[in-house]
């Protein structure tokens, strides 16, 4: 091989390696991306069954029904007439309760309009609301900055209680 052919082979091998690495990274990201929706968003734009999403809003008042074992059903609402029924099997965060901010991650069942959650994130304290949920509620005029009592010295800001199956 001449010097020019060796250089061309090294460049071609390097480009092949870079292309393979980019494709692997793109594949990994496409498998882990979960888009965020509120119940009103789902009413406008339905999501295909078995597509992973994050569903955020407030736990509906009077909607929490505990089943056998650690099975729980509740609704997530955004303050409007839109609500999504959620089915979760696992231990809920200690701070989970009706009227609290919540973000669930999972997918819709292939049959019916029930959201099957495998992760539940609960609002940490009375002043913290997950940014995604707060932004959507602000856009609808249902949330204002400074809602709730001030926490002691900003304690707990930016933290979420998390439960996963």
UniProtKB/Swiss-Prot annotation:
Residues 144-165 are annotated as: Disordered. It is found in: Cell inner membrane. It comes from the Bacteria. The chain crosses the membrane at residues 8-28. Coiled coil: none annotated. The keyword Transmembrane applies. Residues 144-154 have a biased composition (Low complexity). It is a single-pass type II membrane protein. InterPro entries: CcmE, CcmE-like_sf, NA-bd_OB-fold. Residues 1-7 are cytoplasmic. One of its GO terms (cellular component) is plasma membrane. Signal peptide: none annotated. Heme binds at residues 124, 128. One of its GO terms (molecular function) is metal ion binding. GO terms for biological process: cytochrome complex assembly. Keywords: Cell inner membrane, Cell membrane, Cytochrome c-type biogenesis, Heme, Iron, Membrane, Metal-binding, Signal-anchor, Transmembrane, Transmembrane helix. The keyword Aminoacyl-tRNA synthetase does not apply. Residues 29-165 are periplasmic. Belongs to the CcmE/CycJ family. Heme chaperone required for the biogenesis of c-type cytochromes. Transiently binds heme delivered by CcmC and transfers the heme to apo-cytochromes in a process facilitated by CcmF and CcmH. This is Cytochrome c-type biogenesis protein CcmE. It comes from Rhizobium etli (strain CIAT 652). The lineage of its organism: Bacteria, Pseudomonadati, Pseudomonadota, Alphaproteobacteria, Hyphomicrobiales. The gene is ccmE.
